[in-house]
């Protein structure tokens, strides 16, 4: 599933091509995504896309009269195409958002876990977004906040990091990578992590996500950016999916454990 860096890469890739453009139409080839796509063509036609922002793993297209909420699901992608290029839709290209000046935003979703929703209220108050915690790349998220949110929690620190009510967008890949940078064993109880180590972990999260965005995200299976190219952050992984390989810092073999429904990867020497 695309995590925060991948969604931010997509946002940056499409924002300049969407902002200021008017919507000319909507083609829905398959409405059966995670939630059925509502009838929106009459509502959207003529509206101008003012801004393209991100909240967690959701993309928000502010159209003035309302906001289009997009989620890429497990394997979705967005591409901004010129109609003149005459690129025929493929099997899993379920939705085209037609724009003025001969452009189209094409939503591809092979596994159909994505979403295209519309709200006329404040987008951040939508039931899918209202519970979300702070954005990790903003000043609202720091070591003090992480320390306060982890007190009296017996769950593992990795599981807590992946709780979107604590902080948004830190999925399995980036939780593993940030914990390595911070030198923290993923199985440690969150409530036992001290203030100093929480500060280091918050900084490691910011650094990891920032580096991933600059590398175009991670492409392990399906992810491609809006230009159709894969990301390259997987080439920089410290621990994720490197079971049995030597730690890039100390040479100790990376180990793998199961936490909930997810695999965790760590260096038993570097992470305590």
Curated annotation (Swiss-Prot):
Involved in base excision repair of DNA damaged by oxidation or by mutagenic agents. Acts as a DNA glycosylase that recognizes and removes damaged bases. Has a preference for oxidized purines, such as 7,8-dihydro-8-oxoguanine (8-oxoG). Has AP (apurinic/apyrimidinic) lyase activity and introduces nicks in the DNA strand. Cleaves the DNA backbone by beta-delta elimination to generate a single-strand break at the site of the removed base with both 3'- and 5'-phosphates. GO terms for molecular function: 8-oxo-7,8-dihydroguanine DNA N-glycosylase activity; class I DNA-(apurinic or apyrimidinic site) endonuclease activity; damaged DNA binding; zinc ion binding. A zinc finger (FPG-type) spans 238-272. The gene is mutM. It comes from Nitrosospira multiformis (strain ATCC 25196 / NCIMB 11849 / C 71). PROSITE patterns: FPG_CAT, ZF_FPG_1, ZF_FPG_2. This is Formamidopyrimidine-DNA glycosylase. Its EC number is 3.2.2.23, 4.2.99.18. It catalyses: Hydrolysis of DNA containing ring-opened 7-methylguanine residues, releasing 2,6-diamino-4-hydroxy-5-(N-methyl)formamidopyrimidine; 2'-deoxyribonucleotide-(2'-deoxyribose 5'-phosphate)-2'-deoxyribonucleotide-DNA = a 3'-end 2'-deoxyribonucleotide-(2,3-dehydro-2,3-deoxyribose 5'-phosphate)-DNA + a 5'-end 5'-phospho-2'-deoxyribonucleoside-DNA + H(+). SMART domains: Fapy_DNA_glyco, H2TH. Monomer. DNA binds at residues 92, 111, 153. Binds 1 zinc ion per subunit. InterPro entries: DNA_glyclase/AP_lyase_DNA-bd, DNA_glyclase_Znf_dom_DNA_BS, Formamido-pyr_DNA_Glyclase, FPG_cat, MutM-like_N-ter, Ribosomal_uS13-like_H2TH, Znf_DNA_glyclase/AP_lyase, Znf_FPG/IleRS. The active site is at 2 (schiff-base intermediate with dna), 3 (proton donor), 57 (proton donor), 262 (proton donor). Its cofactor is Zn(2+).
